[in-house]
């Protein structure tokens, strides 16, 4: 009973810290306001989602938590921001407020009081709220590569089969375009000290509606990624143990279904954990996993004797939209770039971080795509690990790497979704906010990803759908639209023209890819 009360108190602190900050910010009314601050709405509720930045920090590994509890860490971070933060600014105008004047005035008042009444001299840096900028340049590069080079690597050779060799130029072009849109997000972040995350950018550009729309898309992408993890783990395990089956009360389950259920039961306890720091550190090793997978593929082709053979079409017009979706899936990590930027000790080096990360991942994708397709040709499957001969040691290492890696990432990926949904529970309902209800809610959410994975167990097609619909919006369309809106009146015609061109490319690619992916999905299910 005491444990539940403690849990309830932590959750109340987690979701009400923002309300306390709102009250504190209202006490600063004596400070002269800027033109934008005069438009502030005092009665607008705190915008959803409030837990985005902290939960995404865990996912990216940019600032692995050192406290014993994620909730405690989150609460401490929020309470340190006594001058207000982005989450207490629900409207577009509030996010664009220049808080330097307010902060400077309040700090000066505190210093004056301490000096005149208590004869104390306080260093300025102790009174100024500090952002958690702890990542070095090299750590930021690793974080960038880690979030970019994910499970999409496995399906790059399959994309060559679908789109042909010339489709690699599309992959390269997406690398350049998404690098540029990442720079646009950085410029949006620099526009105001109150902007820290992608939802903040959406809010600054289009108000609360923009924040909610961007957040929903980001959470749908995370949820879909968890579905892909289950499909990926079950496919690779069924490749290793193809004769596995299960019969229960007349129901027959093949190896893929058995392992989908098994892996879900394995990852389920990890979503109940309050301390995800260990998983965060393990997930940060995703770069090593990706390199290991590529080395195993090359080893199987060059040393184990699979060989390399040039084949395939130059361009497959019919299936190129599916390839476009897969390529887009490989570059849809813009949701976490603002977190990486906000965590850097030297934010001015963020463009270089993006350049190195995108250059490495683009060339890495191309190398794996060429290597995998020349090894297996038109027989290539949705994941190249499924084509590797199971009796080779390199194949076993690759398969187990493809199984273990998503196990470490599942809880970190689904946690932002769970926290955002738990925010919607009324604060007055203590029963709904109990530990038992929270565990039940999380269990249902995890089981729902299993149901989706069993319904559409097609890794490449689901990847193409995510890349075409969500990644095009997040990585191409929204960065340009938000940039134009936030920087209104300060852009040249050339800059606006480039943004409009990218938006058109994103819309055309997204529509064609989404239609083709849905059509193929229907065909595979029937």
Curated annotation (Swiss-Prot):
Topology class, membrane: Multi-pass membrane protein
A cellular component annotation (GO) from this entry: organelle membrane
Signal peptide: none
Keywords on record: Amino-acid transport, Membrane, Transmembrane, Transmembrane helix, Transport
Subcellular location(s) per record: Membrane
Annotated stretches, region: Disordered: 1-49
Transmembrane segments: 140-160, 165-185, 212-232, 253-273, 278-298, 320-340, 353-373, 397-417, 436-456, 458-478, 494-514
GO BP annotations, alphabetical order: amino acid transport
Keyword Ribosomal protein in annotation: no
Domain of life: Eukaryota
Annotated Basic and acidic residues bias: 8-18
Family, per entry: Belongs to the amino acid/polyamine transporter 2 family. Amino acid/auxin permease (AAAP) (TC 2.A.18.5) subfamily.
Name assigned to this protein: Amino acid transporter AVT1E
Organism: Arabidopsis thaliana (Mouse-ear cress)
